[in-house]
Curated annotation (Swiss-Prot):
Main location group: membrane
Coiled-coil intervals, chain numbering: none
The encoding gene: HRH2
Lineage: Eukaryota, Metazoa, Chordata, Craniata, Vertebrata
Protein name, entry field: Histamine H2 receptor
GO molecular function: histamine receptor activity; neurotransmitter receptor activity
Length: 359
């Protein structure tokens, strides 16, 4: 999800420091991959999570998952080895994937904020405004725009500082070049403008939600639904807040590097703000679990279903064996007096009184 930049490699002289950084980066990658896999599986298992809003959340989780699988491992290797060892061609692919995933993440968060805005500002028309077809079109546009902006700009050299150097690769470095125009345009289009719109939408959402809560506080039937809706909004706002905290320092450094030169930022500082941005991909699943009850339920179902199924199977086997033993030991007269149980489609059992079968 790193936008238009890759891991800045700085050499670590201390062995202990290098081991510590290796462990931290490995844990971050593991949490990113595992956490976003859990998000996708939870939505698949829990029907309450299968709604249009969560389509964008799943898209965001897929983006972060791809980041953890396709970008972060190579960023960590580059960070720790202090050199790029995978060649020029793969450097261009790697940086293009990095930019694409960042753009997709921002656009997903942007669409989530618009979805929440429609749900709170005009709840009666929400089913008309947000339809499955429109959501599908939005998701397709998110990925088409992301692919176009990333691969097109890098492979055509729009980010380069001179006409002769259109690549992103030197002998030992793999780093996207940033010129003045590219730094300003990309920073505004992919981060600052979406961030501004999201802040405005969430401000209006919270303002309307607060006014509605005051007006309908005495109506219990509306109160429960409103509380659930507001909790979902708070959760999504927390996700966006984490995104701002994680990525704002990097984009500030990115624009500054475009204005002042590729070497204007200290490599240590650049690496810190970059990996702070990467950490956002690991935070999103944690935020869902901490703030959203439906996601907590989905996580519980995911982690407990296999254990529950295993225990249920063992219990069923013991019950069947016990029932068979009792049946074989009963006398025929006792079997005839056994109450009749009628199984209905609703899943409940209706027990007939003894002797009902004799009538």
């Amino acid at each position: 999800m790193a936008p238009n930049g890759t891991a800045s490699s700085f050499c670590l002289d201390s062995t202990a420091c290098k081991i510590t950084i290796t462990v931290v980066l490995a844990v971050l990658i593991l949490i990113t991959v595992a956490g976003n896999v859990v998000v996708c599986l939870a939505v698949g298992l829990n029907r309450r999570l299968r709604n249009l809003t969560n389509c964008f959340i799943v898209s965001l989780a897929i983006t972060d998952l791809l980041l953890g699988l396709l970008v972060l491992p190579f960023s960590a290797i580059y960070q720790l080895s202090c050199k790029w060892s995978f060649g020029k061609v793969f450097c261009n692919i790697y940086t293009s994937l990095d930019v694409m995933l960042c753009t997709a993440s921002i656009l997903n968060l942007f669409m989530i904020s618009l979805d929440r805005y429609c749900a709170v500002m005009d709840p009666l028309r929400y089913p008309v405004l947000v339809t499955p077809v429109r959501v599908a079109i939005s998701l397709v546009l998110i990925w088409v725009i992301s692919i176009t902006l990333s691969f097109l700009s890098i492979h055509l050299g729009w980010n380069s500082r001179n006409e002769t150097s259109k690549g992103n690769h030197t002998t030992s470095k793999c780093k996207v070049q940033v010129n003045e125009v590219y730094g300003l345009v990309d920073g505004l289009v992919t981060f600052y403008l979406p961030l501004l719109i999201m802040c405005i939408t969430y401000y209006r959402i919270f303002k309307v939600a607060r006014d509605q809560a005051k007006r309908i506080n005495h109506i219990s039937s509306w109160k429960a639904a409103t509380i659930r809706e507001h909790k979902a909004t708070v959760t999504l706002a927390a996700v966006m807040g984490a995104f701002i905290i994680c990525w704002f320092p990097y984009f500030t450094a990115f624009v500054y590097r475009g204005l002042r030169g590729d070497d204007a930022i200290n490599e240590v500082l650049e690496a810190i703000v970059l990996w702070l941005g990467y950490a956002n991909s690991a935070l999103n699943p944690i935020l869902y679990a901490a703030l959203n009850r439906d996601f907590r339920t989905g996580y519980q179902q995911l982690f407990c279903c296999r254990l529950a199924n295993r225990n249920s199977h063992k219990t069923s086997l013991r019950s069947n064996a016990s029932q068979l033993s009792r049946t074989q030991s009963r006398e025929p007269r006792q079997q005839e007096e056994k109450p009749l149980k009628l199984q209905v489609w609703s899943g409940t059992e209706v027990t007939a009184p003894q002797g009902a079968t004799d009538r």
